[in-house]
Amino acid sequence: MKVKVLSLLVPALLVAGAANAAEIYNKDGNKLDLYGKVDGLHYFSDDDSQDGDQTYMRLGFKGETQVNDQLTGYGQWEYQIQGNSGENENNSWTRVAFAGLKFGDAGSFDYGRNYGVVYDVTSWTDVLPEFGGDTYGSDNFMQQRGNGFATYRNSDFFGLVDGLNFAVQYQGKNGSASGEDQTNNGRTELRQNGDGVGGSITYNLGEGFGIGTAVSSSKRTSSQNDLTYGNGDRAETYTGGLKYDANNIYLAAQYTQTYNATRVGNLGWANKAQNFEVVAQYQFDFGLRPSVAYLQSKGKDLENGYGDQDLLKYVDVGATYYFNKNMSTYVDYKINLLDDKEFTRNAGISTDDIVALGLVYQF
């Protein structure tokens, strides 16, 4: 019986963190779920900036309220707290915080700190035990989590086509702490963005197959264009992906092409970049889930005579074992394929392997 329960449970644990949430309140159309996890995590690497304790916890809630038969209000908040730093250090941050309204089959609208629509597709490969999903990053235009997202989503195309989902999104400017690009939440150039728009379409074809595409285009700030790498009026992202999720097998791949939107270490952005991620996993009924993946990001026509350079390139081999719905452990080996050379050193790009060992309690 335990084996059968695990085989049904594990796929649910691999989606949003709130899938295993604890229901705190559910009465009169009002519902509140609390979720979280503690990851006792350690990295082993020759890279001194990565090697060592990486323990952290995440805590969040999801709530909704039934206004009437066709209108539902909802909100979500998620916070991360690092457990590998001293008590006098402020090392925590908000991952998401947004509120919205759902209008029956007409779709939903929300605003706040959320995921960019590009992640609707690239998230399909962001399922590795520890690493992965790093051909893009947070607070990088509309590629992952960011501030000031206004998002309209529609599931099953107004209730007419099962599995056909689309989203349209706007992101407001997040500029610098002072000067021409100043906004109330100023930040460094690598995490700034101008006004942006994006959209995504995903279609579940049935039998476990899915296909999706997403695009985004954001204005760049003048501060960003003061950097040497990746000058241009706009940052653009075009992505497409495929996945298969059935019969205990998970396969996914995504290809993304960007213009002035993929970071070149700590130097700026690539004028053009080609990003590729592919992952394969299998879920055994007794709780073991092995995983293998390949990720590469290649920058094109880089300044200072660097030309074409790999910004990221590695093979990932790992496995997760689920004791039950609340407890798991994993190992993840990032086999770095980048060479240590002038470019990687100047850009601050690590070329060392990393082995991650984690023990996770989640609710």
From Swiss-Prot:
CC per GO annotation: cell outer membrane; pore complex
Top-rank taxon, per record: Bacteria
GO biological processes: monoatomic ion transmembrane transport
Membrane topology summary: Multi-pass membrane protein
Record function comment: Forms pores that allow passive diffusion of small molecules across the outer membrane.
Family under the similarity heading: Belongs to the Gram-negative porin family.
Subunit structure: Homotrimer. Probably forms mixed heterotrimers with OmpF; other mixed heterotrimers are also probable.
Protein name according to UniProt: Outer membrane porin C
